[in-house]
A protein has these predicted regions:
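Low-complexity, glycine/proline-biased repetitive segments and flexible coils/loops
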Residues: 1-196
Length: 196
């Protein structure tokens, strides 16, 4: 998921602390931020609805028959774009999924929120673990699922938070709810190689 360091020391950061409303939603939401430490490479899940948030772009939002945003764009080499909202319903409907580190967010069906994009696998600790998935979009007829630590979207409810220590996006709200969930906090893995 990205590394940095000198002389045998490598730092891997997976994600970062997410701010509220990360992931696809049916209303505007907040941003998942990339670490501002220049020595750290980050890979996040879904960002804010309709914004270029963190590494993964947020899902497109929809409310009361009007497309309120366009999908956010992912950061090259770190995350992917968010998915589009549904276009067939004349009422508040499904939000697109947040982009994950490994794939774009899914596009929403009629009134059902879309799934977030998948994350990326890292085996730096010796066991492969997939992290930094996108959060699911909210919907009025069903919720989208967050993948690889991403929070589920809300079914006429607020979204669920991303899993801690994954850097994955939170789920977006559905229906007339406007509170998405925070992304999972990031982790830093240090690996040292002793020189003979």
């Amino acid at each position: 998921l990205g590394g940095s360091g000198n002389a045998g020391q490598y730092t891997i950061t997976i994600g970062g602390s997410g701010s509220p409303n990360a992931g696809g939603a049916s209303s505007p939401s907040g941003i998942v931020k990339v670490s501002d430490q220049s020595s750290v490479v980050s890979a996040l899940g879904g960002g804010s609805t309709g914004n270029d948030g963190g590494s993964g772009g947020g899902g497109e939002g929809r409310g009361e028959g009007t497309l309120t945003t366009t999908p956010g764009s992912g950061t090259a080499g770190q995350g992917n774009d968010g998915g589009t909202a549904s276009i067939n319903s004349t009422t508040a409907a499904g939000g697109g999924g947040g982009g994950g580190a490994g794939a774009v967010g899914s596009n929403a069906g009629d009134s059902i929120g879309a799934n977030g994009g998948v994350g990326l696998s890292s085996s730096i600790t010796g066991t492969a673990v997939i992290r930094a998935g996108g959060g699911g979009g909210g919907g009025t007829a069903g919720r989208g699922l967050g993948l690889n630590g991403g929070g589920n979207g809300g079914h006429n409810a607020n979204g669920s938070a991303g899993t801690a220590n994954t850097g994955s996006g939170g789920g977006g709200p559905g229906g007339n709810r406007n509170d998405g969930a925070t992304g999972g906090s990031g982790i830093v893995i240090l690996r040292y190689q002793f020189q003979s």
